[in-house]
């Protein structure tokens, strides 16, 4: 058994060498034939060889047979093609199955030095798990299934986890403030069908109960720049909080690297009963334009008209605008740098409240160094402080997070990672009596998630799928 890794390496090396020799023979034969074939015939053969090689190397997106799977973000959103994938894959005769997820076991203290009265601490385990499947339909069709589950209601608690200055949703009739709400047990159950209608052109329909409408950037759990941070951004409800929507339908059109989408969906956030299915209303709308100018960039701009998103403020409708830029650069087979910049704003009850997020993750083999900066504007009502501030002023909130983690072991394509991070919050002057001038948060965690799929593994997986089909 101790020689098994060497044998596997030799087998993989031999396979790669054989494939290289085979490709070299193909190129030599093709060059020889080109000397005797007419120009058009030679060009046709070269195009066929290029298309075959491209097909062999690329696992396709769930929403296009012409795009790489690496481009798929959450819902129907895009990330850069350069984005590596952390998942397991299993191929059957006609289907490709994918498993993805993350589990944090941590201790979280939101006010280490007890500077204020709003911090909290607890042991908990934020988590989420995905199962995805897809299959080709005829010559130009593609059918896909997406599911996502979270055991947050059990491992975090129905009231969520402590997070200073976080707002959004309710529990036991009160607004959740300085806490991040738990995600629902059923976070996504959606299906999609894509039809290739012309070269580099797709039309698709995605429906979910729950699902994610075409609004905002990919949700934070599915952004490479945020995957190491267990916390939701303070700007979550300004940009990507609609990722769990009970009732959504999205129609999209893609031409090359440009995509236009529109959604109709339920504006109301999930209720405090995290194990059931909320009533679908289909009373809200959104539109999103996505552009990937190169394999390293993904850009989007979107707008949503949300009807009564918060149960605590049922008469408050929200106009949400977002814009984002995501950049990913591979530095090696297991090293990369990923950066995301997001601007989001909510316009409601006559005010426009902006939020800016900048996050980055530098992965160097087994060690990751990551950070997040946020600026968020929230009013007294959102922080549940109307009694203290009758005129409901806006407060400017800033927070900086730095963290580091290291992969301790990889067993059966699964990483065990240990990390720690700290957040420095900058309190507005009027809120210092409650929060302190600069409360410091700290957490330490163990993380379990699928290991990085390297390029050689993705090529072999796709070749196995082609052989099965």
For every predicted segment, state its role.
Residues 18-104, 120, 134-137, 146, ...:
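N-terminal periplasmic/intermembrane-space "pro-region" immediately following the signal or transit peptide
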Residues 87-88, 101, 129-135, 189-195, ...:
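Residues on the lipid-exposed face of transmembrane beta-strands in outer-membrane beta-barrel proteins
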Residues 95, 120-129, 183-189, 243-249, ...:
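Residues that define the transmembrane beta-barrel architecture of outer-membrane proteins
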Residues 103-111, 149-155, 209-213, 255-257, ...:
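Transmembrane beta-strands of outer-membrane beta-barrel pores
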Residues 139-143, 199-203, 257-261, 295-301, ...:
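Repeated loop/turn-to-beta-strand initiation elements of outer-membrane beta-barrel proteins
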Residues 154-161, 168-185, 303-312, 336-357, ...:
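Outer-membrane beta-barrel translocator/channel fold
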Residues 156-290:
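Surface-exposed coil loops of outer-membrane beta-barrel proteins
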Residues 402, 436-469:
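Outer-membrane beta-barrel "beta-signal"
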């Amino acid at each position: 058994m101790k020689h098994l890794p060497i044998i596997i390496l030799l087998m993989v090396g031999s396979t790669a060498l054989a494939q290289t020799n085979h490709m070299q023979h193909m190129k030599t034969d093709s060059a020889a034939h080109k000397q005797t074939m007419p120009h058009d015939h030679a060009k046709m053969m070269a195009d066929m060889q290029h298309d075959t090689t491209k097909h062999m190397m690329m696992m396709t997106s769930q929403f296009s047979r012409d795009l790489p799977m690496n481009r798929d973000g959450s819902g129907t959103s895009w990330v850069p093609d350069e984005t590596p994938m952390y998942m397991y894959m299993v191929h059957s005769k006609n289907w490709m199955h994918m498993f993805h997820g993350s589990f944090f076991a941590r201790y979280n203290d939101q006010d280490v030095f007890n500077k204020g009265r709003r911090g909290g601490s607890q042991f908990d385990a934020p988590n989420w798990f995905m199962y995805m499947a897809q299959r080709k339909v005829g010559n130009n069709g593609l059918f896909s299934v997406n599911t996502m589950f979270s055991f947050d209601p059990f491992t975090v608690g129905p009231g969520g986890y402590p997070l200073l200055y976080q707002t959004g949703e309710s529990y036991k009739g009160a607004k959740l403030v300085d806490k991040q709400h738990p995600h629902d047990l059923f976070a996504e159950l959606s299906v999609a069908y894509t039809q290739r209608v012309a070269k580099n052109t797709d039309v698709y329909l995605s429906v979910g109960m729950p699902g994610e409408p075409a609004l905002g950037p990919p949700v934070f759990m599915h952004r490479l720049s945020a995957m190491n941070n267990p916390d939701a951004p303070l700007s979550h409800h300004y940009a990507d909080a609609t990722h769990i929507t009970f009732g959504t339908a999205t129609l999209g059109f893609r031409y090359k690297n440009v995509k236009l989408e529109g959604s109709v969906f339920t504006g109301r956030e999930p209720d405090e009963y995290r194990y059931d299915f909320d009533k679908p209303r289909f009373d809200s709308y959104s539109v999103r334009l996505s552009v990937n100018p190169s394999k390293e960039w993904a850009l989007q701009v979107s707008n949503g008209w949300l009807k009564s998103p918060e149960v605590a403020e049922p008469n408050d409708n929200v106009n949400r605008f977002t814009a984002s830029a995501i950049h990913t650069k591979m530095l090696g087979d297991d090293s990369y740098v990923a950066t995301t910049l997001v601007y989001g704003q909510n316009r409601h009850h006559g005010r426009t409240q902006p939020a800016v997020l900048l996050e980055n993750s530098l992965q160097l083999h087994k060690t990751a160094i990551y950070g997040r900066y946020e600026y968020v504007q929230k009013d007294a009502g959102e922080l549940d402080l109307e009694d203290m501030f009758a005129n409901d002023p806006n407060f400017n909130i800033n927070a900086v997070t730095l963290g580091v983690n290291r992969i301790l072991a990889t067993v059966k394509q699964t990483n065990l990672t240990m990390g720690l991070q700290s957040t420095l919050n900058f309190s507005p002057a009027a809120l210092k009596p409650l929060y302190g001038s600069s409360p410091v948060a700290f957490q330490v965690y163990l993380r379990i998630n699928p290991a990085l799929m390297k390029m050689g593994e993705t090529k072999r997986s796709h070749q196995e799928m082609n052989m099965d089909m």
